[in-house]
Amino acid sequence: MARYLGPKCKLSRREGCDLLLKSGVRDHKSKCKSEKLPGQHGDKKPRLNSYGIQLREKQKIRRLYGILEKQFRNYYKKAARQKGSTGENLMALLERRLDNVVYRMGFASTRAEARQLVAHKAILVNDKVVNVPSFLVNPGDTISVRQKAKNQGRIQAALALSEQRAPCDWITVDTGSFKGTFSTAPTLMDLSSDYNVNLVVELYSK
C-alpha cells in the first residue's frame, strides 16, 4: 500500500494552504509555522505560467486526499469515461473512497488515520469488514466502527475533533452508535472552494 511518508507540513507549505494532513488538536499555523515555501530558496516565490498553475492545483488535490500520481490519473481516466462533468465526476470518485468517508464521518482525525483504520479492519461497510482504503462507497451504504475498535482512544479523540468541522450534507452520522450513512455523492457546490478541479481537467486533457 504505497503512501507518502515524508513531513506533512512541508506539503502544506508547498501548496500554500492547510491540506488537513495533521489532526486539528493544534492550529495549522502553529504546527507549520513558516509561511515560506520549503527548501533553500523558499522565500523566493516563482512566477507560474498556466501549466504551473494547473500542476500546483493537481498536486494540491492529490495530496489533500493522500493519493499517489498513478492512482490519481486512473481516477481522472475513469471520471472522463463517465457521463457529465469530468471534474465533478473526479471529485465524486475521490469523495467516495472509504478512507475519505471514514474521515468525513469523524471516525478519524485525518485521512491518513482513516486509511490505517480501514487497513487494520476496524471499519465495516454494510456490516461487513472492508480493509481496502480505495473501496468506493455507494449511496445508501452504511459505514460503522467494529465493536472491538470503538474504545480506541484515537477514535474517541477524532469524534471530539470532528465537532469543530462543518457537517457534510451528504453524510448522516450517529456518533453514539459509531455509525453513519453515505447518502449521496457530493457536487462541486458542496465541496471546498479552496481548489479548482477544472484546472486538473485542463492539465490532463492536453
From Swiss-Prot:
Q: Any idea where the S4 RNA-binding domain is?
A: 96-161
MF-aspect GO terms: rRNA binding; structural constituent of ribosome
* Record Gene3D superfamilies: Ribosomal Protein S4 Delta 41, Chain A, domain 1, RNA-binding S4 domain
- Which chain regions cross the lipid bilayer? none
UniProt entry keywords in alphabetical sequence: Ribonucleoprotein, Ribosomal protein, RNA-binding, rRNA-binding
Q: Which PROSITE patterns match?
A: RIBOSOMAL_S4, S4
- UniProt cross-references to InterPro entries, sorted A to Z: Ribosomal_uS4, Ribosomal_uS4_bac-type, Ribosomal_uS4_CS, Ribosomal_uS4_N, S4_RNA-bd, S4_RNA-bd_sf
In its UniProt record, which GO terms are filed under biological process?
A: ribosomal small subunit biogenesis; translation
Query: Which cellular component appears as one GO term in the record?
Result: small ribosomal subunit
Report the superkingdom from the record: Bacteria
Q: Name one Pfam family in it.
A: S4
Q: Which SMART domains match?
A: Ribosomal_S4 (SM01390), S4 (SM00363)
Q: Which NCBIfam families match?
A: PRK05327.1 (NF003717), rpsD_bact (TIGR01017)
Task: Spell out the family assignment given in the record's similarity comment.
Answer: Belongs to the universal ribosomal protein uS4 family.
State the protein's purpose: One of the primary rRNA binding proteins, it binds directly to 16S rRNA where it nucleates assembly of the body of the 30S subunit.
Q: Which PANTHER family match?
A: 30S 40S RIBOSOMAL PROTEIN, SMALL RIBOSOMAL SUBUNIT PROTEIN US4M
Q: How does it assemble?
A: Part of the 30S ribosomal subunit. Contacts protein S5. The interaction surface between S4 and S5 is involved in control of translational fidelity.
Official protein name in the record: Small ribosomal subunit protein uS4
Q: Which organism is it from?
A: Legionella pneumophila (strain Paris)
